[in-house]
């Protein structure tokens, strides 16, 4: 029960922090393969409209604005809405793409600055491939796990992404059903902007096929030191391939299919020496206190 309350407290704190910030950045996916199109979303939570000035050149990827911006619902902001801008990022090599801080000029005269962003680019070999049998046709699909920290501390949050690479036959997904060993996890959900407003999924052209990319995000919490694992299944709605193109123009049959999620392994570490004995979970079950003799303080005075 304490662990559940701690996790809920962490989620509440993150939500309040997002609502308080005037500039929020979030990725459609921050782990991709070369050629995969992803998006960096910039959200002005006060509803200001910013100019789309030329973007910087970065090593290993191309950047471009992909929309004039639009409004989305954002609780806690004026009129309950925020201004959303999107940058399409397409990497061309394996490694890490570093995007510097961006300065945005708004129509109200304000200047907004984003934090530097990092995009991880995996080799194609990191995708684990499998096949579905749809109406006698073998339909391939792939999955890729991204975990921020491969060696987290016990009970500490470790953000992750599960990415699905599928052809056009796969139409939509339910939330993945995850099976874990010595590991707790949040429910896997689509990315923030997909939840707030339906946004295009990622895509990548690989071996002559245009793969649609769906990303689910979550957080892992190792429960003990050593190797911990996660795997599972995800249910998808798929269109059955029709042998006769003429019939396919008028009739489309659909079916629910179960897609296997490959196992991911991480190695959890014991808490470091000197950690408080009650440092037990993601939020921290410990006490922070301070004292001061001063009665009158100036801004930013220690």
Question: At which residue positions do the language-model features occur?
Answer:
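Surface-exposed interaction/ligand-binding surfaces
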Residues: 20-302
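Sec-dependent N-terminal signal peptides
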Residues: 4-15
């Amino acid at each position: 029960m304490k662990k559940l309350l701690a996790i809920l407290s962490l989620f509440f704190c993150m939500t309040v922090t997002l609502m308080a910030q005037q500039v929020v950045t979030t990725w459609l996916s921050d782990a991709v393969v070369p050629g995969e199109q992803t998006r960096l979303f910039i959200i002005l939570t006060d509803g200001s409209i910013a100019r789309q000035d030329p973007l910087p050149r970065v090593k290993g990827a191309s950047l471009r604005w992909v929309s004039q911006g639009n409004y989305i619902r954002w609780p806690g902001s004026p009129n309950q809405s925020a201004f959303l801008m999107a940058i399409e990022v397409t990497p061309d090599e394996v490694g890490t793409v570093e995007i510097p801080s961006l300065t945005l000029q708004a129509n109200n005269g304000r200047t907004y600055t984003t934090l530097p962003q990092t995009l991880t680019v995996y080799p194609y070999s990191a995708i684990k491939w499998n096949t579905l049998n749809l109406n006698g046709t073998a339909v391939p699909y792939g999955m890729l796990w991204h975990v921020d920290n491969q060696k987290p501390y016990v009970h500490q949050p470790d953000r992750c992404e599960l990415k699905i690479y599928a052809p056009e036959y796969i139409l939509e997904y339910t939330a993945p059903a995850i099976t874990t060993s010595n590991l707790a996890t949040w429910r896997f959900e689509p990315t923030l902007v997909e939840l707030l407003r339906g946004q295009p999924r990622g895509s990548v052209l690989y071996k002559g096929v245009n793969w649609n990319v769906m990303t689910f995000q979550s957080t892992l919490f190792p429960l003990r030191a050593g190797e911990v694992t996660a795997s599972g299944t995800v249910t998808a709605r798929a269109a059955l391939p029709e042998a006769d193109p003429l019939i396919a123009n008028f009739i489309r049959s659909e079916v629910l299919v179960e897609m296997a999620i490959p196992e991911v392994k991480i190695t959890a570490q014991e808490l470091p020496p000197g950690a408080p004995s009650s440092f037990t979970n993601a939020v921290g079950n410990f006490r922070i206190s301070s004292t001061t003799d001063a009665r009158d303080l100036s801004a930013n005075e220690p």
